[in-house]
Amino acid sequence: MGRPRAGRLAVVAVALGAMASAVSPIPPSPPAPGVQFVFTSDAHYGLTRPAFRGGRNVDAHTVNAALVARINALPATRFPNDGGIRAGELVGPIDFVAEGGDITNREEVAGGQWVQPASVSWRQFVADYVNGVHVADRGGHPAPVFIVPGNHEVSNAIGFYKPMHPLVDKTPLVDIFNRMTMPAVARTTSTYDSARDRVFFTRDVGGVHFVFLHVWPDSAMRARMTADLSRVARSTPVVVVTHDQPDAEAKHFVNPNGRHDINARDQFENMLADQFADGTSVDAPSTREQRALERFVSEHPQIRAYFHGNSNWNEFYEWRGPDHTIALHTFRVDSPMKGAASTADETKLSFQVATIDAAAVMTVREYLWNVDPRHPAAGVRWGAAVTVALRPYSHN
């Protein structure tokens, strides 16, 4: 998809080209109250990169393992002197790592051959991220990896309008659901119900309420959020982590045509709860759906930030909705395998590091983790950064 026109956030602190420091022998100061996390998305296991660190057609297992190695090295890296939260300090504790979905590429033909089964891709992700992230939170405990599904996990589980092999593989979506929502009775690939068992979970970390949800905030997810936020103080900042951008893609909604099924003619993917209301074509803008989300955010002003993947480049922007009644701080992140810029130029590979202080001020920094492919250990740099306030206020 093309880059949307979006109002840029007012940048309080920007660091372009500030080199990350080498590992320092000086121990970090005790962490202040707040929260710090890494956000990455669209790992796309099953695909290959055209080039990576001198290799050709490098698989996602190799690339993502290299990304995780840079996450593990973060605590001993210094923030740039960019005027943002904790500028110039050692990064120190990482409270969690968030993965924004599209972990396992669809099992369709890519580059003239079938993409590996989703269950194989999922095992590689678990090895690299779930078992491979070795950073600690501010309490000294291993930092968890929080996961939301993307459209590829859902298509692998329910089917797609193009041929896939196997036709369905529910393994990743079922395991995400079980690991993240911890149901009383774990689902299996036989008992998982894609309409009933949608991923929704929350975590309270450092005075911030994080909401992690299934693909996009459709009517079902908004109903879950309404119930959840009724138990959260309105003074508590809320951060949403999901896969799709706020201006959702029409094709992800339920087919409004005929039998409302997944078919090659209509090309709707039927992964959200709502039937598409803006026409009969996947090329139509999702104006009504976006308007419903805009109204929801306006009614819940404690929702202050939104992190997403899917469109695969680093961007900090304000989403205002079709009627421009809100200003939601929104953060789009790069993909290690399908980056809009980083696929052609591996030195632009990045993820995001978010730091929130006790006053609920947040700095989000782009971390360019492969700027010198010939010397990976030295080839890191801080990129763009933005600082925003998270304290709830009226959007109007």
Predicted feature locations:
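N-terminal active-site segment of His-dependent metallophosphoesterases
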Residues: 25-116
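Bacterial N-terminal signal peptides
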Residues: 10-20
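Extended active-site neighborhood of metal-dependent phosphoesterases/phosphodiesterases
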Residues: 108-224, 230-237, 263-271, 316-338, ...
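His/acidic metal-ligating clusters that form di-metal
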Residues: 69, 73-93, 138-144, 190-204, ...
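A short C-terminal boundary segment appended to hydrolase-like catalytic domains
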Residues: 345, 349-396
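Short, solvent-exposed loop/turn elements at domain surfaces
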Residues: 35-37, 45-51, 79, 220-224, ...
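Bacterial N-terminal signal peptides that target proteins for export
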Residues: 1-11
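Active-site glycine-centered loops adjacent to acidic/histidine catalytic or metal-binding residues
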Residues: 42, 101-102, 150-151, 243, ...
